[in-house]
From Swiss-Prot:
InterPro entries: AAA+_ATPase, ABC_transporter-like_ATP-bd, ABC_transporter-like_CS, ABC_transpr_LolD-like, MacB-like_ATP-bd, P-loop_NTPase. The complex is composed of two ATP-binding proteins (LolD) and two transmembrane proteins (LolC and LolE). It is found in: Cell inner membrane. This is Lipoprotein-releasing system ATP-binding protein LolD 2. ATP binds at residues 43-50. PROSITE patterns: ABC_TRANSPORTER_1, ABC_TRANSPORTER_2, LOLD. Keywords: ATP-binding, Cell inner membrane, Cell membrane, Membrane, Nucleotide-binding, Translocase, Transport. It is a peripheral membrane protein. Belongs to the ABC transporter superfamily. Lipoprotein translocase (TC 3.A.1.125) family. It comes from Chlorobium chlorochromatii (strain CaD3). Its EC number is 7.6.2.-. Its main location: membrane. Gene3D superfamilies: P-loop containing nucleotide triphosphate hydrolases (3.40.50.300).
Amino acid sequence: MIITMLDAQQLSKSYTLAGKRTINILQGVTLRVHEGEMVTIVGASGSGKTTLLNLLGTLDTPDSGTIVFNNQPLFQNNRYTLSRKALAAFRNRQIGFVFQFHHLLSDFTALENVAMAEFIATGNLQAAKVRAAELLTNFGLSERLDHLPSELSGGEQQRVAIARALMNNPKLVLADEPSGNLDQRNSQLLYELMARISKEQRTAFIIVTHNYDYAAMADRCFCMENGLLGEYKSYEKSTAV
């Protein structure tokens, strides 16, 4: 059964610059993503990709449109349906974030970086470390648990960042140019890892990238241009559920 995880309808966003000139960043963007689906969004710099991720992740506020997450309305009638505190709690439980720059804490080991979110939420350090170790081992980092970020390769650092994003078992992961600083081999491995996670854990991924080759590894690919979103390529994989 296909379960819709995220349903965003007619999202628009504009900014007013100095001199009161208004720039329309997003214009009536509609996107529906299903459970366990990997979706990529390609487009030139400044096309609105990152702004869209920020709206979908409730990090910014749309001018108009609706956002429904797992059948729960989050944004409608030009406002969020939850208080700021409740929205932050919802975001921390349901959404994971991966960025081009991993933002790992330099004085903490890979294990500690991943375990921290759950430890802060539950206060149970031992359980958090067990869960973090399981994730990192699943990502091929069992021998890197006690290494600092500076002791890891770029590909390993991004795998740690993805493990951290998955620590709270989110329903959706938003990734903004996650392979931007990686070489071709590590980029390929990273996308293969995200594709595997999406199917094994039924976690939806929305990935912004400028690389069309990696984008084609997704279940669906969209193209963003001048604030408008259109489907670039749609096909079924033999591995799709």
